[in-house]
Amino acid sequence: MREKTVIAADLGASGGKMAKGSYNGSRLLAGDFFDFENKPIELNKNLYWDLFALYNSILQGTVRYSQDCEADSISVDTWGATYGLLDSKGRLLEPIYHYRDLRTEHSMERMYQNVSREKVFQLTGCQPARSYTLPQLYSYVEHQERILDLADTMLFLPDLLTYFLSGEKVTERSIAGTSGLLRLDQEDWCYELFRMLGIQTDMLLPLTEPGTERGMMSRRIADSLNIKQMKVISAIGHDTASAVAGIPYFGVGQVYISIGTNINMGVEVTESVTGETAFRGGYKNAAVMEDRKILYRDFAAFWLLNEFQRSCREEGCSYSYQDMMELASAAKARSVFVDTDDEILNNAGGNIKEKINAFLERSGQETLTEDADFIRCILESIALKVKYCTEYLEKELHIPLHKISVINGGTRNYVLMQMISDALARPVYCGLPYATLTGNILTQLYALGELGSVDEMRDLSGRSFSMKEYHPVEKRKEYWDSGLQKMMEKGVCK
């Protein structure tokens, strides 16, 4: 067979990545990774994504990969919930808001005055955070803005970039599932919720399946880049769902933990899981591909480390990720933890060390002074949250688990990987630092007819890539068990 070559772009909240994937019929090669910056823009007290810088970076990567071969296709996945509004002529109506923009600071509480949190979960299977599309759209209603009346089309970020590349407007189902706006079965929009909140629906498109060709890259773009046209594919637009689709031999009874700016962790299911226990545990449902869904929780992870780096730079001290791992390894375990879901810790700006100490003081814990202790506190808090969520799946939702797979860029943090293994008191399999790109590439091969199912995608991933196994240190089990018990009593882990 002729070797297939595809280009994958993955936009994360902290940065973008691209790769070229080559498939010869038996093994997949993914390489020539190209990283680029995703730097938000603050303007007049609002926070925006630099959409056109991201788009230009994708074009640069496309040129790079087209120098020595003709690519068959390209696809883009992104973080969830971010959207763009277009007018009837296909023009953007406003800049693309960052999900941490403060215009939604009070939108959740006001939204729940109209429709209860429980009702939203019953209708959608989702428990939106402030960063989700639902509260962002409700903020227009809350502030009596007319922007939705002017909008002809709403496109989520991967669909918006697909539109830029091909001229085709579509809404792919997995990325729409990050919005908090779909029905419980994840098959269509929850029009009842739109009506209850007074959000108009004229800008919505029908949902389409991932792994579908969307036409060719526009000739104008190809000519301007001096490259051959290629197919544009809607892969699995939601970055986490894309990563899950590419985990080697993943399936029932396994937990995935995708670590980057945020953690998204959960299990794969065929039917949405609802009920009081799932609701109380903060779990949500979202679509992946075929009839597969994920039951998951998400919370901040390296966002806190990024904020720590920023705060230290403002104080005149610069730490690399390697520096932080070494400091954390050398620091004493103090058994102090923060809730990575805490709203104040997740607001942009301010000094994260001051925010952490304020949280520790409020929760009756020892405050910190040394940078190494702050770093260790952040990492241990992430590991403790993972432990809490994993035990909730097993003990409260009664989902038997026999394997833990940790994926994406966070797996490079060997200190955190060992902490997670120790906290869970079981082996964890870590790897695929570019798992989302891998899933993107595999889904393109599916769309091109080279693979026939998600199972075949995962089998190919298993034949092509290896995972590193971390084993727990038995003597540390008591530290994590007592830490979780203490934090649950204080209401820190929830």
Language-model segments: residues:
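N-terminal glycine/serine-rich phosphate-binding loop of ATP-dependent small-molecule kinases
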Residues: 1-94, 122, 222-232, 424-426, ...
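Active-site core segments that coordinate phosphate-bearing ligands/cofactors
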Residues: 7-8, 112-124, 138-156, 162-168, ...
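Short acidic-aromatic active-site loops that bind/stabilize oxyanions
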Residues: 47-55, 126, 130, 207, ...
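Short glycine-rich phosphate-binding loop at a beta-alpha junction
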Residues: 70-79, 153, 206, 398-408
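Glycine-rich beta-strand-to-loop/alpha-helix junction loops that act as flexible
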Residues: 77-82, 210-211, 259-261, 403-412
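Carbohydrate-associated surface elements
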Residues: 101
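A conserved helix-loop-beta module that forms one wall/lid of the active-site cleft
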Residues: 197-210, 441
